[in-house]
From Swiss-Prot:
A GO cellular component entry from the record: plasma membrane
Family statement: Belongs to the complex I 49 kDa subunit family.
Record-given protein name: NADH-quinone oxidoreductase subunit D
Entry EC no(s): 7.1.1.-
UniProt-annotated location(s): Cell inner membrane
NCBIfam families: NuoD, PRK06075.1
Recorded catalytic activity of this chain's protein: a quinone + NADH + 5 H(+)(in) = a quinol + NAD(+) + 4 H(+)(out)
Organism for this UniProt entry: Campylobacter jejuni subsp. jejuni serotype O:2 (strain ATCC 700819 / NCTC 11168)
Known function: NDH-1 shuttles electrons from NADH, via FMN and iron-sulfur (Fe-S) centers, to quinones in the respiratory chain. The immediate electron acceptor for the enzyme in this species is believed to be ubiquinone. Couples the redox reaction to proton translocation (for every two electrons transferred, four hydrogen ions are translocated across the cytoplasmic membrane), and thus conserves the redox energy in a proton gradient.
Organismal lineage: Bacteria, Pseudomonadati, Campylobacterota, Epsilonproteobacteria, Campylobacterales
C-alpha cells in the first residue's frame, strides 16, 4: 500500500535539462569513501559536476533534545558520540560551557591535563584524516604507517582514562584523574619519535606525482568562500586566513605556551594537507611545554565548589555533609544560575562550540552544538561544482568531515 505524501524525492527537487549528456547519480549513503552515512546527489555533464546536493540525517540521534532530559553531568558521555574521532574535544567544549555558566574556575593542574588530552586527541584525529585521505587516493602505505603511529597515541589516552575512542575523561570542574606514574616520560618519548615518522609521510607524499596531481588545484576554496560558508579550522587557514581560537580567544593555558598557527594561501587540497602536517609539529611543541607546566602545579584536579562539584571520595565516605551534597548532585544535577552562554573552542576540524540556555534547573532548557563538519558539509553544494567526478572522493576526504557531528 502506498502511503500518500506531499514530499517529493530529492531528485525531483533538482531541476536540470533533459539532455543526453546530463545524468544524476547518488554517491552514498553507503559508500566507503563517504566515511559515514552521507549521500551526495550529483548532477553530471559528462564527468563534470554541475550541481551537488548533500543529504544528511541518516545518523541523526536527537542529541540536543536528549540534553534537555539529562542532568548536566549525564550528558558528558553523549558528547563523545558526536565527533567520535576527537572525543576529548567534545568533552572539553561542553564542560567549558557549563563551567562558564556556573562561574567555575578549574585548578591549574586540571587545565594542563586537559591540554594534554586535547593535543593528543588532535594528533590522533589528524592521523586518521591523513590515513583515510591517502587511502582514498590510493596511497596504501601511508594508511598503514599512520595507523601504526596512531596506536602509540591511543595507548597513551587509554593509559589515562581506560578508553581509546570515547573517553568521557573530563568532569565539570576539572578532570577525572591525575596523570599515572611515568605518563609524561612516555608522552615525551613519543614526542621525540614522531617527527621522524612525519618526515616519512612527507617523503612518501610531497614529491609523489600522483598525490600532487590529485591534490594541487583541486578543491580550491577562496577566502571569500571560506568566510561566506562559515568555514573554520584548516579549511579557513588553508585559504590564507590565519585564525585559531586558541590564539584569538585563549582558553585553559594556551596563552602560556608558544606555538604557531600554520596557514597557506593557495586554498587547494594540497595546501590544506601542508597545514595539517605542520599542525602535527605545533601539537608536539604544546605537549612538551605542558610537561613542564605540569611539574609546577599543585595536585588538585577538581574545583572546590560543593554546589557544583562533588567532594573527594574520602570526604564523601567520612563527612555527612559531603555525602548529602554528592547525593543531590548525582540525583538532581548541578543547578547553574539562569542565563545563557556560548563557548567556542578549536577542535581538530574547526570551531566547536556549545550554546546553553539555563532556566536554573538541573537540566539545560536548550542546548545547541556548533560543529565544524556541519558547515563544511553544506559547502559541498558550491565546492564540488565544476570538479570532475573522479575528484569528488578526493575532495570529500580532504575536507575532513565526520558524520557523527553532522547528524547530531
Amino acid at each position: 500500500m502506498q502511503i500518500p505524501s506531499k514530499l517529493k524525492p530529492y531528485y525531483e527537487n533538482i531541476a536540470f535539462e533533459q539532455e543526453d549528456s546530463k545524468m544524476i547519480i547518488n554517491l552514498g549513503p553507503q559508500h566507503p569513501s563517504a566515511h559515514g552515512n552521507l549521500r551526495l546527489i550529483l548532477e553530471l555533464d559528462g564527468e563534470q559536476v554541475v550541481k551537488a546536493r548533500p543529504c544528511i540525517g541518516y545518523m541523526h540521534r536527537g542529541m540536543e533534545k536528549m540534553a534537555e532530559n539529562m542532568i548536566y553531568q549525564e550528558f558528558i558521555p553523549t558528547t563523545d558520540r558526536m565527533d567520535y574521532i576527537a572525543a576529548s574535544a567534545n568533552n572539553y567544549a561542553y564542560c567549558a560551557a557549563v563551567e562558564k555558566l556556573c562561574g567555575l574556575e578549574i585548578p591549574r593542574r586540571a587545565a594542563v591535563i586537559r591540554m594534554i588530552l586535547l593535543e593528543l586527541n588532535r594528533i590522533t584525529s589528524h592521523l586518521l584524516w591523513l590515513a583515510t585521505h591517502a587511502l582514498d587516493i590510493g596511497a596504501m602505505s601511508v594508511f598503514l604507517y599512520c595507523f601504526r603511529e596512531r596506536e602509540y597515541v591511543l595507548d597513551l589516552i587509554e593509559k589515562y582514562c581506560g578508553a581509546r575512542l570515547t573517553h568521557s575523561s573530563m568532569r565539570i570542574g576539572g578532570v577525572m584523574l591525575d596523570l599515572p606514574e611515568n605518563y609524561l616520560e612516555e608522552m615525551l618519548a613519543f614526542c621525540d619519535k614522531f617527527p621522524n615518522d612525519l618526515k616519512d609521510y612527507e617523503d612518501l607524499l610531497d614529491d609523489n606525482r600522483i598525490w600532487r596531481l590529485r591534490t594541487e588545484n583541486v578543491g580550491v576554496v577562496t577566502k571569500e568562500q571560506a568566510l561566506n560558508w562559515g568555514c573554520t579550522g584548516v579549511m579557513l587557514r588553508g585559504s590564507g586566513i590565519k585564525y585559531d581560537i586558541r590564539k584569538e580567544e585563549p582558553y585553559l593555558l594556551y596563552n602560556e605556551v608558544e606555538f604557531g598557527v600554520p596557514y597557506a594561501t593557495q586554498g587547494d587540497s594540497y595546501a590544506r594537507y601542508k597545514v595539517y602536517m605542520q599542525e602535527f609539529r605545533e601539537s608536539l611543541k604544546i605537549l612538551r611545554q605542558c610537561a613542564m607546566l605540569y611539574k609546577d602545579t599543585s595536585p588538585e584536579i577538581l574545583a572546590t565548589h560543593p554546589e557544583y562539584v562533588s567532594a573527594s571520595k574520602e570526604q564523601i565516605l567520612t563527612q555527612n555533609y559531603s555525602l548529602m551534597q554528592h547525593f543531590v548532585l548525582i540525583t538532581q544535577g548541578l543547578k547553574p544560575p539562569k542565563g545563557e552562554v556560548y563557548v567556542p573552542t578549536e577542535s581538530p576540524k574547526g570551531e566547536l562550540g556549545f550554546f546553553i540556555h539555563s532556566d536554573g534547573t538541573g537540566r539545560p532548557y536548550r542546548l545547541k552544538a556548533r560543529t565544524p563538519s556541519y558547515w563544511h558539509c553544506a559547502f559541498f553544494e558550491e565546492m564540488l561544482v565544476g570538479t570532475y567526478l573522479a575528484d569528488v572522493v578526493a575532495i570529500m576526504g580532504n575536507v575532513n568531515i565526520v558524520l557523527g557531528e553532522i547528524d547530531r
